[in-house]
Amino acid sequence: LSCIGMNQPHVMIGTAPAASSLLFRTEDEYSDHLFDQHSWAPAIEYADSVGVDVINTSLGYYTFDDKSKNYRYRDLNGHFALMSRQASRIADKGMVLVCSAGNAGMGSWKKTTPPGDAENVITVGAIGKNGELAPFSSIGNTADNRIKPDVVAVGVFADIIGTDGQPSMANGTSFSSPIMCGMVTCLWQSRPELAAKQIIELVRQSGDRVDLPDNI
């Protein structure tokens, strides 16, 4: 949250410090089950009902306690995972979903985690402040050969306010995603006449590799 909403001059200012925020907790931190994805949907529906414009989701799934439910690369088509199907429809409701690409880049999985494979969402990878890709940042393409992540933001030594209320730094696409989410919020504020899908495409076109895209 501090990546977006912090507003303490000379300490830290987030990327959308004047935005109003709602927090939703949708998963059981002590287990990994498909049910967590079912819990996510009501949060999105409630956000829609109260007029939320931009949503950040710093979570993703590809392994579960029941290993038979683990996703495979061929499942990353934006339609197989329940959460990805739900995410793909958010822009049709007039909201923009910004989500973390995942931190599996150095493991055997490597790929973007659902819902980051969804269509009509902004999937965010991580870079350092020097512009270099974070080695842990999950990569694409999707199984149906769409470019993912869509863009990147700082996720290595990202500035945050810790749970103790003190300035700190952290690594992960869980931080690059809200940093980008705040930027998207300010962009939409400046161009309120644009629809959600137009904002998504505008952000994609802002990347410095838009003319020669790669999968990282």
Go through each PLM region and give its residues.
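Glycine-rich, acidic and aromatic/proline-enriched surface loops and short helix-turn segments
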Residues: 6, 53, 57, 150-157, ...
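Hydrolase catalytic cores
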Residues: 1-3, 22-28, 111, 155-216
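Structural detector of well-ordered beta-strand residues that form the stable sheet scaffold
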Residues: 22, 96-98, 123, 152, ...
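Glycine/Thr-rich phosphate-binding loops of Rossmann-like dinucleotide-binding domains
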Residues: 65, 131-133
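Subtilisin-like serine protease catalytic core
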Residues: 1-36, 50, 66, 92-94, ...
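Substrate-binding/access-modulating region of protease and related hydrolase catalytic domains
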Residues: 26-117, 145-146, 163-177
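Carbohydrate-associated surface elements
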Residues: 127
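Internal glycine-rich alpha/beta core junctions
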Residues: 137-158
